[in-house]
Amino acid sequence: MIGIFDSGVGGLSVFREVRKVLPEESYIYYSDNANCPYGGKSKEFIIDRARKITELLLEKGARIIVVACNTATAVAIKTLREEYPAIRFIGMEP
């Protein structure tokens, strides 16, 4: 299963594109609407949210996690990769 998360619904466009390439996969999408947007939040807050969402997605069976949020990628993906070395994280990186 591939887990995808964003601070809102913008990541749905990422989900649609991934699904075109990997239609046989199962997916779970998490939108953190209650805390959207992340842009004005502290780094600590964003990292904490990314950890909590990652844990939720892992509990649901995700093997790969797509961080479909520019802000979460910029702030938290390095931490996620360090803390969850067995999980592949794909971010919105140039």
Q: Which ranges hold each PLM region?
A:
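Non-catalytic structural scaffold of enzyme domains
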Residues: 1-94
